Amino acid sequence: MQINLKDVSYIYNEKTPYEKKVLTNINLTIEEGHYTVIVGKTGSGKSTLIEHFNGLLIPTSGEVNVDEMVIVAPKNKKERRELAKKLRELRKSVSVLFQFSEQQLFETTVLKDIIFAPLNYGISEEEAIERAKELISLVGLDESYLEKSPFELSGGEMRKVALCGILALEPKVLILDEPTVALDYRSREEIMDMVKTLQKEKKMTIVLVTHNMDYVLKYADIVHVINSGEIAFSGLPEELFSNKELLKDNSLELPKILKFYYQLKEQNIDIGLFPREYRELTDSLKNMIKRKKENE
């Protein structure tokens, strides 16, 4: 499932004294099966952008194409009704996990929370429960958690349950808006590794909004930088992090691993690759030291 934005602009509170243009002529493609990361400083328009991907927001001008479906601003009541029907089905395939997603939990048990959306889309209770059991295991929680109140869980556990509720619809595209914010290190890594597993095993398209440059380097197939509602860069992580001027202009920092990598290069120590993970860096250093010893 490919998402394509053509000349998309969005204005909050249009035709009021509080009118504010947030997106300007966005042209962007989310490729099927890719892990796409969107970055930019606070207030740049990232969250507004992703809410166009499944019609939570409708472009003021321009169009959003999701496979064969075209989303444009409706001109009358009839078009609004028709669009609302199409968007309901679209949101089954393109799902969003928002910041502080644990605030979306509301049922008395974890099970009821996870099966709420599938039941509302006409999936049988038996199948919904089977999905819940599979998903709770996928996120690393015991099946006994299904009978617990979600409000008895830790922050990381609640975030995992919220993710299960999204995944229960079996979306083709999963959009995550700062999914690890305010979590401890272990919970952050568990969630990010889990999302990568979903992409690989279920061939799911992932869109991640983050301020964490380490995640950009480690996970992104493609990265888009948004600044003041416009696309400032689209390309590979290596291209982004090799352009110091671009990073500075968009208030982005190098990932920690690349800071060390460039310090090595300044000392004429070339490890021979652009590391995306600490393991790659340490393995390359070990191999370099080994070769040096063998040549002595």
Label every model-predicted segment.
Residues E170:
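Conserved catalytic motifs of ABC-family nucleotide-binding domains
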Residues G62-K78, L90:
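Conserved ABC transporter NBD signature motif
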